[in-house]
């Protein structure tokens, strides 16, 4: 047992604790929090319902863990309060984490756009976190199913109900655990097959914190029957594209799938898309396709339109575009206005998604615990001393790419 004294205007209150800190969730946020708390001499316990810790780290980056981004800043996060993200990022930057990896001699490389991946596998990151936890004397218990978290009541542990921080009781398939502080690092709703749940939101509401509506983010987009038939015929093709929605735009890979559209550019824009809104896709960014088609007509008039489009696009996609436009013959068979319309369509393909693939494949959850109720420097609930929320459970969602 650990004993803490909390003086206040009414005198002293004595609270008996099993641990200084109990962290719910053995993912990236929970383990990093445990390490830092342990380094400060706190007695830390991490609880998770999974059989293995850090499952989301394990599957991230195609198994190589895209662990951070060299260009990370607050502008790469979606939140109702951008200033919160800016302040939070100042507490621990991407460079701090890179230095941690270097101290463990973990080899990594930049793939593109500042995205850093392990040369080996995601297990390198997990092993590093386990090693750091052990060095900080952090206790980790897996397959722990938590039923409830509550404030201490008027039992023997509490001598004064006016105590500023009365501590918490964590209850589940184990003997009740008493802790001075509890950190909720349970993540969001994305990828339920690895154990995602809304437990963190339930606890936030119980203690009076507001929630920002949640929805899937970084998720493939789906389409109606006609567009879906086209996507199925093009399944497996990828192009470098620019995709826009509202004021957001991303220039990265786009992938046709048997369910719709995916790839980094689509995952990015999905976080900015709302039901009913169109997205605009530039299939050949940086090239004026209308001008190119008209110039090609003058230079090689007998060339068919499909071959001309194939200069920049995969043959199957070029053929599909020609079929949709009814322009499968030679360039000379079409007037400049028709070629201009086709070129414009290639640079500004307008689509209205029917929806997304949902939390099943979403990489993140947008929304969550409203940051208005949290301190941006400590992540502690402003009206509940000792209760903290970190990671994906909070309303602060990053771009794809670390």
Which residues fall in each region the model found?
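N-terminal Rossmann-like FAD-binding beta1-loop-alpha1 element of flavoenzymes
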Residues: 19-46
